[in-house]
């Protein structure tokens, strides 16, 4: 067996997994969490995990669906986000060779309310962080640990956590 104090010390030294319910910008007036959730099941689990934490404010969910992948999941993910979140922003997530707007239209088929649509992911992150009220949580889903956005066959540098951290700094400075 392992001594309990040794096991506890080892557990305390563990680092969180990048892009999996990753908190961004500790100490700010809103919570921002980045997660790789890119399937219906993963999105629902991420939303439910975030909702289980102590948070009195609204839950914002920002997500998109990848292009050239299973189009059948898009409306289902829209349904899940719109059912469980207080505010939803639908955006791009590696559209690859597809039109970002066409992917978003597929997602919107699953929404029975009116989510915010912003195809530019950087602008969507900026919008969510700017519009969130004190105590709100913003869940940025779909890319997690990825450091690129694939558009038209080109991988462009893009990191959800870095973009969110930049916007949080701007929010705190204002």
What are these regions (language model features)?
Residues 1-174:
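ATP-dependent carboxylate-amine ligase
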């Amino acid at each position: 067996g392992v001594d309990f104090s040794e096991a506890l010390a080892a557990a305390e030294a563990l680092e969180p997994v990048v892009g999996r319910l990753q908190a961004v910008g500790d100490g700010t007036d809103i919570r921002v969490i980045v997660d790789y959730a890119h399937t219906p099941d993963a999105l629902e689990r991420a939303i439910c995990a975030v909702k289980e934490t102590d948070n009195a404010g609204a839950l914002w969910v920002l997500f998109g669906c990848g292009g050239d992948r299973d189009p059948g999941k898009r409306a289902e993910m829209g349904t899940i986000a719109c059912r469980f979140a207080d505010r939803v922003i639908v955006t791009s997530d590696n559209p690859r060779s597809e039109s970002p707007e066409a992917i978003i239209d597929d997602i919107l088929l699953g929404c029975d309310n009116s989510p915010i649509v912003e195809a530019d992911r950087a602008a969507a992150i900026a919008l969510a962080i700017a519009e969130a009220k004190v105590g709100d949580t913003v869940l940025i889903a779909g890319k997690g640990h990825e450091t690129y956005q694939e558009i038209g066959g080109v991988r462009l540098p893009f990191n959800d956590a870095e973009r969110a951290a930049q916007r949080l700094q701007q929010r705190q400075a204002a």
